[in-house]
Amino acid sequence: MITFPHRHLLGIKGLTEQDITLLLDRADEAVKISRQREKKTSSLRGLTQINLFFEASTRTQSSFELAGKRLGADVMNMSVGNSSVKKGETLIDTAMTLNAMHPDVLVVRHSSAGAASLLAQKVSCSVVNAGDGQHEHPTQALLDALTIRRAKGKLSRIIVAICGDVLHSRVARSNILLLNQMGARVRVVAPATLLPAGIAEMGAEVYHSMAEGLKDADVVMMLRLQRERMAGSFVPSVREYFHYYGLDAEKLKVAKDDALVMHPGPMNRGVEIASEIADGPQSVIEQQVEMGVAVRMAVMETLLLSQNQGPRL
């Protein structure tokens, strides 16, 4: 029997240390399933998962789809580009239409912060936030935490440096919340133009120099420079950005010798990370992809099989 006090996964905010640990422990079990020759279970047989992505994301959508299918669920991917949304239907109209089909879980990605929470108020099934604007991306933070925990054996009392375009990154926000909750020491390293207001109040130490921010770090998490979200001139040029904030061998030297190098993907090679580092021995970027499927399996199974579904987050 699974006991989990939440009906939805809308963000890391609202999860306790115990909630996070439960999800990570279940994800560890899901890793074993994914590494078997026979990868499919029947735990969610007869249940329906709808992936509703208003933003294109091949990686995340594929990961959620595979997670649901490995648990035996019926999975439907709704292509928004070919849907009534293009004809003027609102987010709520779409949600109500899908709700009438009686799905068991909606996985939602949307460009507007709070979209998943809004849907959760309108539908009778569970909702999983697969990224909402610059707000949160909870399953990414969970998979990052699982990757770190499996490599380091713990999350507490480690130094994690999150570097790059923090301003536009929902990944950074969710990771800061989770890592602080689990007792890690979190740093953000970025030019002032790529840092949101109030970042220090979230529990992150702020650095503007890679040499200082990466010193003795256990984990270096690089963020994609999200040029498609930029309305102004946040960086002088891509070349200058890489010179000061791109991760290369020289900058990595100040971190611990066994520091992990992470990236949520997709990468801009030569912009925020050099290929020699992305493909190097300290990189766990491929492991992050593997852990993503396991974490999403754990989330689906926990939400849908919980015997104690409580208030919405």
From Swiss-Prot:
Q: What class of enzyme is it?
A: transferase
List, alphabetically, the Gene3D superfamilies matched.
Aspartate/ornithine carbamoyltransferase (3.40.50.1370)
Could you give one GO CC term from the UniProt record? cytosol
Gene Ontology molecular function, alphabetical: amino acid binding; aspartate carbamoyltransferase activity
Q: Where does L-aspartate bind?
A: K87, R170, R224
Report the superkingdom from the record: Bacteria
PANTHER family, alphabetized: ASPARTATE CARBAMOYLTRANSFERASE, ORNITHINE CARBAMOYLTRANSFERASE, MITOCHONDRIAL
Protein's name in the database: Aspartate carbamoyltransferase catalytic subunit
Could you tell me which species this protein originates from?
Answer: Rhizobium meliloti (strain 1021)
Name the gene behind this protein: pyrB
